[in-house]
Amino acid sequence: MKKLTNYLMKVGMCLLGSVAFVACGDDDPDDGPAVEGLTVTPTSLSFTKDGGEKSISARAGQNVTASSDAAWCVVTIGEKTPTLKVTPINVTVEANTTTEQRTATITVKAGAESKTVSVTQEKGETKPDSNPDPSGNIKYDAKQVAKLMYPGWNLGNTMEAGSNTNSWKSVGVSTETAWQKTTTTKELINFIKAQGFKSVRIPCAWVMGHITDTNNCTIDPQWMARVKEIVSYCVDADLYVVLNQHWDGGWLEHDGFTANAAVALKKQQLTKIWTQIAEAFKDYDDHVIFAGLNEPGVGGAYQDNGKNIADDKLASRLAEYEQAFIDAVRATGGNNEYRVLVVQGPETNIDKTVKNNYCSKLNDKHTGRLMMEVHFYDPYQFTAMAKDESWGKMWYYWGKGNTGSDANRNANSNYTENYVKNQMAKLKTAFVDNGIPVIIGEFGANQRFAIGQDPIHDASIKAWYAAVTSYAINNGCIPYAWDTNSGNGMSIIDRSNIKVLNTNMMTGVTEGVAAAKWPY
């Protein structure tokens, strides 16, 4: 009897196993109504930068499988509810340590049917506040940060404004509106971010109107506070900032390149100025980048005989000043130890900068932390020429298909799209390919007529901005559009009313970015 009982129990267990096996089969004929097709809810998931777990429900009459196309997004199948034919799918997302928003696609299948679920996770970099943590560090080298910075916009004619008659004096913070009428606000900077710009270049005067002690080159603390306030507007908006020492009355950019320049004294003064700036921004993270000068040697590079100083001598003189800038910043330590710094080529002229292998003249204690700066306003007859001259006329029309009836107003074909492309390619070969990103610190062209007055001119402006933007980005250069807030000329944004003023320029930049591809 005991043997028979054991035998019947074994048979019963086998039958139960058979039933369980069938219940997991493709047809699933167990309890509950038949289910047609495959239904998946929700069809999208979003995660914070910290990641976490969420679930998806898949209802189908057949077995469900799921897969993810991203390693950071993992899916696991739960136990199916027999009566409802619902299979839970657990989605686990890792913390995002990158600086970009990322996406993944989950594919859910049941038999021949499949559905997809989109997964989005916010970027991992948290928004810095106006008073960054002093213990913060610099996460990116020059190459890494460069691809996060394009396109760029200039807060032009603002913090660099004033009069050279006030050099080595202190005249207060009112100079911000000396050349244009609008005080910079947080709302303006947020609007700049909304237009798609990722970084802001802040041209800045220090010597010209903001020195309280000439011997020590002491910067007016009120001026420094105002500069920090604007920089913080940008950092709060997750915009990168390039802060420079601009023309600044020409005390260095002109006077430092004359035949009789007191080079040693100029280097001492530059060191004192940049030491103060570096100390003031020491705790800011890598959203803040320093640029030593602006257009060094422009208008001041003359020998005693009245001829332009030879390019190699200009580059060597400039290297002395730039080295003083680099050493001053690094000596302040903290985040400045590894902060990315921007040095300028001779006159920020592309050909002169490439020709002299300029960066080989500089020494930084850390590799991969320098960028090169040049400016681009070519061809001059189209971008900036203010009146016809005996040697040539102003060009109103530029680019493929933009030809006017007056041949004298059409740009020479040697200076259209291919010229821009080739100039940017020179920078890639000389610098970017050798680990030194480039910023086109300024580029711009004057809108000569009211928008709508001359459609071919409108198309030319848009084409030029698009070409410079796209060819720069394609070659690893960050383009910064020059903007003066003057209502005409090179003005993109109406800062008083916080709106786009010149749609030709803005559209050109936007289309240029869309057409471009960063080279690495």
Predicted regions and their residues:
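Acidic/histidine-rich helix-loop elements
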Residues: 156-184, 212-219, 261-262, 381-419
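Active-site region of glycoside hydrolase catalytic domains
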Residues: 264, 268-414, 425-445, 474-475
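A short beta-strand micro-motif common to beta-rich folds, especially ectodomain repeats
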Residues: 99-112
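Bacterial Sec-dependent N-terminal signal peptides
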Residues: 14-44, 111-135
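Surface-exposed binding patches on compact interaction domains or structured appendages
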Residues: 37-38, 59-90
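An active-site-proximal structural segment forming one wall of the substrate-binding cleft
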Residues: 179-200, 210, 215-247, 251-292, ...
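Substrate-binding cleft of secreted/luminal carbohydrate-active enzymes
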Residues: 411-498
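N-terminal carbohydrate-binding accessory modules
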Residues: 126-199
